[in-house]
């Protein structure tokens, strides 16, 4: 007999509108952070981390979408940060504007476009109360959020007198 090791996935009709909106906000929040943090791409990542920690206790549905949004933002934030600092180095320290840098900018642009498309799809699906799994990050988020916790894992410590 196989025991299910994951919590049941909530269905759209079981979710409150507020949960759907909070899950959608995990994906759309990056657009607001993008406007404020365009020259500093790490601000998007900081905003995603804050959003996750604020909303992780609301429901498994919101926590899943917040974590998936956060994890999927990690690679693009790193790519963007490298592009910004590499570009600043070229501008301020008279390094050459090479074909390698141009190719890297194309890579960063394509990665950001893919991230934006997936984020919009994820936001629409979350607003409908549906689960949407990104290629790698969806599985990691699902396993992290929906895995059942062992009941004996968090035993309370017993107070003891000091050793004599």
Which residues does each PLM region occupy?
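Hydrophobic alpha-helical transmembrane segments in multi-pass membrane proteins
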Residues: 18, 22-45, 68-119
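Membrane-interface extramembranous regions at the lipid-water interface
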Residues: 2-37, 43-71, 122-164
């Amino acid at each position: 007999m196989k025991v299910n090791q994951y919590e049941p996935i909530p269905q759209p009709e079981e979710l409150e509108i507020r949960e759907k909106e909070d899950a959608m906000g995990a994906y759309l929040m990056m657009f607001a952070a993008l406007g404020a943090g365009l020259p500093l791409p790490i601000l998007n990542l900081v905003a995603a981390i804050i959003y996750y920690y604020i909303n992780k206790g609301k429901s498994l549905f919101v926590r899943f979408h917040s974590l998936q949004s956060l994890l999927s933002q990690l690679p693009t934030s790193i790519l963007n940060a490298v592009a910004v600092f590499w570009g600043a180095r070229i501008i301020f320290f008279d390094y050459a504007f090479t074909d390698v840098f141009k190719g890297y900018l194309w890579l960063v642009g394509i990665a950001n476009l893919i991230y934006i498309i997936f984020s919009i799809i994820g936001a629409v699906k979350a607003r409908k109360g549906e689960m949407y799994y990104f290629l790698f990050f969806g599985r990691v988020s699902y396993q992290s959020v929906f895995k059942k916790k062992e009941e004996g894992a968090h035993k309370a410590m017993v107070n003891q007198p000091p050793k004599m």
